[in-house]
A protein has these predicted regions:
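Short helix- or helix-capping micro-motifs
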Residues: 1-3
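Extracytoplasmic
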Residues: 6, 24-29, 51, 87, ...
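Structured C-terminal helix/loop/strand segments within mature extracytoplasmic catalytic/sensor domains
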Residues: 13-16, 59-160
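Mid-domain, small-residue-enriched loop/turn segments at the edges of structured enzyme/sensor domains
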Residues: 8-65
Length: 160
Protein backbone atom coordinates (compact mmCIF):
# COMPACT_ATOMS: atom_id res chain seq x y z
CA UNK A 1 0.00 0.00 0.00
CA UNK A 2 2.94 2.28 0.60
CA UNK A 3 5.85 2.88 -1.70
CA UNK A 4 8.84 1.15 -0.17
CA UNK A 5 11.51 1.76 -2.78
CA UNK A 6 14.27 1.36 -0.20
CA UNK A 7 13.23 -2.24 0.51
CA UNK A 8 13.24 -3.10 -3.18
CA UNK A 9 16.63 -1.42 -3.54
CA UNK A 10 17.94 -3.68 -0.77
CA UNK A 11 16.54 -6.84 -2.39
CA UNK A 12 17.33 -6.27 -6.08
CA UNK A 13 21.13 -6.49 -5.78
CA UNK A 14 20.73 -9.89 -4.13
CA UNK A 15 18.60 -11.10 -7.04
CA UNK A 16 20.84 -9.60 -9.69
CA UNK A 17 20.21 -7.81 -12.95
CA UNK A 18 20.23 -10.95 -15.10
CA UNK A 19 17.68 -12.82 -12.96
CA UNK A 20 15.44 -9.74 -12.75
CA UNK A 21 15.54 -9.42 -16.53
CA UNK A 22 14.56 -13.10 -16.81
CA UNK A 23 11.54 -12.62 -14.55
CA UNK A 24 10.40 -9.46 -16.34
CA UNK A 25 10.71 -11.22 -19.70
CA UNK A 26 8.75 -14.23 -18.38
CA UNK A 27 6.05 -11.83 -17.18
CA UNK A 28 5.95 -10.05 -20.55
CA UNK A 29 6.55 -6.82 -18.65
CA UNK A 30 7.32 -4.05 -21.13
CA UNK A 31 10.81 -4.13 -22.61
CA UNK A 32 12.09 -6.13 -19.57
CA UNK A 33 15.28 -4.03 -19.71
CA UNK A 34 17.11 -3.89 -16.38
CA UNK A 35 20.13 -2.21 -17.93
CA UNK A 36 23.61 -2.78 -16.60
CA UNK A 37 24.42 -4.37 -13.24
CA UNK A 38 24.93 -0.81 -11.92
CA UNK A 39 21.27 -0.04 -12.75
CA UNK A 40 19.95 -2.84 -10.50
CA UNK A 41 18.66 -0.45 -7.81
CA UNK A 42 17.14 2.12 -10.17
CA UNK A 43 16.22 0.44 -13.48
CA UNK A 44 12.49 0.85 -12.81
CA UNK A 45 12.78 4.39 -11.42
CA UNK A 46 15.17 6.21 -13.74
CA UNK A 47 16.61 3.41 -15.80
CA UNK A 48 15.87 1.68 -19.05
CA UNK A 49 12.75 -0.29 -18.05
CA UNK A 50 9.70 0.98 -19.92
CA UNK A 51 6.16 -0.22 -20.41
CA UNK A 52 3.23 1.14 -22.40
CA UNK A 53 -0.31 1.42 -21.12
CA UNK A 54 -1.38 -1.50 -23.33
CA UNK A 55 1.50 -3.65 -22.08
CA UNK A 56 0.61 -2.74 -18.50
CA UNK A 57 -3.01 -3.82 -19.08
CA UNK A 58 -1.83 -7.09 -20.65
CA UNK A 59 0.45 -7.77 -17.66
CA UNK A 60 -2.28 -6.96 -15.13
CA UNK A 61 -4.76 -9.14 -17.03
CA UNK A 62 -2.35 -12.05 -16.73
CA UNK A 63 -1.94 -11.26 -13.02
CA UNK A 64 -5.70 -11.21 -12.44
CA UNK A 65 -6.13 -14.51 -14.33
CA UNK A 66 -3.22 -16.11 -12.42
CA UNK A 67 -1.54 -16.63 -15.77
CA UNK A 68 1.97 -15.56 -14.72
CA UNK A 69 4.73 -18.03 -13.81
CA UNK A 70 4.11 -17.57 -10.07
CA UNK A 71 3.19 -19.95 -7.28
CA UNK A 72 -0.24 -19.88 -5.66
CA UNK A 73 1.47 -18.68 -2.47
CA UNK A 74 3.00 -15.73 -4.33
CA UNK A 75 -0.41 -14.70 -5.67
CA UNK A 76 -1.90 -15.09 -2.21
CA UNK A 77 0.73 -12.75 -0.77
CA UNK A 78 0.91 -10.20 -3.59
CA UNK A 79 -2.71 -9.54 -4.53
CA UNK A 80 -3.96 -8.43 -1.07
CA UNK A 81 -1.17 -5.85 -0.88
CA UNK A 82 -2.78 -4.08 -3.84
CA UNK A 83 -6.25 -3.84 -2.24
CA UNK A 84 -6.96 -0.10 -2.26
CA UNK A 85 -10.68 0.25 -1.64
CA UNK A 86 -13.76 -1.89 -1.05
CA UNK A 87 -17.48 -1.42 -1.37
CA UNK A 88 -20.59 -3.49 -0.80
CA UNK A 89 -20.03 -5.71 -3.84
CA UNK A 90 -16.70 -4.58 -5.28
CA UNK A 91 -12.97 -4.48 -4.58
CA UNK A 92 -10.49 -2.09 -6.18
CA UNK A 93 -6.87 -3.26 -6.42
CA UNK A 94 -4.36 -0.61 -7.45
CA UNK A 95 -0.79 0.64 -7.28
CA UNK A 96 0.68 4.03 -7.95
CA UNK A 97 3.95 4.68 -9.72
CA UNK A 98 6.03 7.66 -10.64
CA UNK A 99 8.74 7.98 -13.27
CA UNK A 100 10.98 10.93 -12.57
CA UNK A 101 13.70 12.18 -14.88
CA UNK A 102 15.91 15.22 -15.21
CA UNK A 103 15.75 14.91 -19.01
CA UNK A 104 12.05 14.14 -19.57
CA UNK A 105 8.59 14.87 -18.27
CA UNK A 106 7.71 13.12 -14.99
CA UNK A 107 4.94 10.55 -15.43
CA UNK A 108 2.56 9.31 -12.75
CA UNK A 109 0.89 5.90 -13.03
CA UNK A 110 -2.18 4.37 -11.43
CA UNK A 111 -2.75 0.75 -12.43
CA UNK A 112 -4.89 -2.10 -11.19
CA UNK A 113 -8.25 -3.74 -11.53
CA UNK A 114 -11.77 -3.60 -10.18
CA UNK A 115 -13.64 -6.76 -9.21
CA UNK A 116 -17.34 -5.98 -9.41
CA UNK A 117 -19.75 -8.57 -8.04
CA UNK A 118 -23.04 -6.96 -8.98
CA UNK A 119 -24.54 -3.67 -9.94
CA UNK A 120 -24.99 -2.36 -13.46
CA UNK A 121 -21.76 -3.82 -14.85
CA UNK A 122 -20.52 -7.00 -13.10
CA UNK A 123 -17.08 -8.33 -13.97
CA UNK A 124 -13.41 -7.46 -13.76
CA UNK A 125 -12.09 -4.21 -15.16
CA UNK A 126 -8.34 -3.88 -15.66
CA UNK A 127 -6.92 -0.37 -16.03
CA UNK A 128 -3.66 1.47 -16.53
CA UNK A 129 -3.59 5.23 -16.38
CA UNK A 130 -0.66 7.57 -16.69
CA UNK A 131 -0.42 11.31 -16.74
CA UNK A 132 2.22 13.99 -16.95
CA UNK A 133 3.16 15.26 -13.52
CA UNK A 134 3.66 19.01 -13.67
CA UNK A 135 2.97 19.93 -10.04
CA UNK A 136 3.37 16.89 -7.78
CA UNK A 137 1.34 18.34 -4.88
CA UNK A 138 -1.79 18.62 -7.01
CA UNK A 139 -1.21 16.11 -9.81
CA UNK A 140 -0.33 13.02 -7.76
CA UNK A 141 -3.76 12.75 -6.04
CA UNK A 142 -5.52 13.25 -9.38
CA UNK A 143 -4.47 9.80 -10.67
CA UNK A 144 -6.76 7.67 -8.46
CA UNK A 145 -9.55 10.23 -8.70
CA UNK A 146 -9.47 10.20 -12.52
CA UNK A 147 -9.58 6.40 -12.67
CA UNK A 148 -12.36 6.20 -10.09
CA UNK A 149 -14.42 8.72 -12.07
CA UNK A 150 -13.89 6.74 -15.29
CA UNK A 151 -15.10 3.58 -13.51
CA UNK A 152 -18.17 5.48 -12.29
CA UNK A 153 -18.78 6.83 -15.80
CA UNK A 154 -18.88 3.32 -17.31
CA UNK A 155 -21.17 2.04 -14.55
CA UNK A 156 -18.59 -0.24 -12.93
CA UNK A 157 -18.58 1.71 -9.64
CA UNK A 158 -21.38 3.54 -7.88
CA UNK A 159 -21.16 7.31 -7.76
CA UNK A 160 -19.73 8.60 -4.46
Amino acid sequence: RHSTVWIYQTITPRIGSEALHGWLAAFGYGNADTGTPEDVTTYWLKGPLSISVREQVAFLTRLVRHDLPLSVRTYDLAVPVMLAETGEDWRLYAKTGWYSSDEAQDIGWYVGWLEQGGGAAPGTYVFAFNMDIETPETDIPRRPAAVRQALVDIGALPAP
